[in-house]
Design a protein with these regions (language model features):
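Beta1/beta-strand and adjacent pyrophosphate-binding region of the FAD-binding site
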Residues: 2-15
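Core beta-strand elements of the Rossmann-like FAD/NAD(P) dinucleotide-binding domain
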Residues: 3-5, 140-153
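Structured core elements
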Residues: 8-9, 31-32, 137
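Conserved N-terminal/central alpha/beta ligand/cofactor-binding core
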Residues: 21-132
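Conserved beta-strand-loop-beta-strand element in the redox core of flavoprotein oxidoreductases
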Residues: 127-147
Length: 153
């Protein structure tokens, strides 16, 4: 049913989406497993991207070619620069985004990427051989293998 994958990413939160996207764009056959395909990149009850700490991370991901900042811009309802009363080194961007459209935008983007497959399931165990993770076992009983001989350019 499934081929062997070069990379299996477990979890489609913000980091999982960025990791799966990056590996697929590098040509690695990538599988992104999530518990709910309708909750990809789901934000918390406070749907903010940015702030003092996360704002710096979003900027760094953007500088490395990531999509979190771009998808945030596409779904922003309000933007504010925090700490304006302090010096410019302390300023921090924060965007309030539409929680539903943000996740939909991420999913639509991921679905356009070659070498990337999305799968709804839950990982319940790892396949380990001589201390090396070789795949995952899912809740519905699939054994999904990683191709350890793959070379990614």
């Amino acid at each position: 049913m499934f081929q062997k994958f070069d990379i299996i990413v477990v979890g489609a939160g913000h980091a999982g989406c960025e990791a799966a996207r990056s590996s697929a764009l590098m040509g690695a056959e990538t599988l992104l497993i999530t518990q709910n395909l309708n909750a990809i990149a789901q934000l918390s009850c406070n749907p903010a991207m940015g702030g003092v700490a996360k704002g710096q991370i979003v900027r760094e991901i953007d500088a490395l070619g990531g999509m979190s900042g771009i998808i945030t811009d596409q779904n922003t309802m309000q933007f504010r620069m925090l700490n304006r009363s302090k010096g410019p080194a302390m300023w921090s961007p924060r965007a309030q985004v539409d929680n539903v459209s943000f996740g939909i935008s991420w999913r639509q983007h991921l679905e356009t990427i070659s070498h990337l497959q999305l799968w709804q399931d839950e990982v319940v165990d790892l396949i380990i051989n001589n201390g090396t993770v070789e795949g995952v076992v899912t809740k519905i009983g699939l054994n999904l293998q990683v191709d350890l001989s793959a070379t990614i350019q």
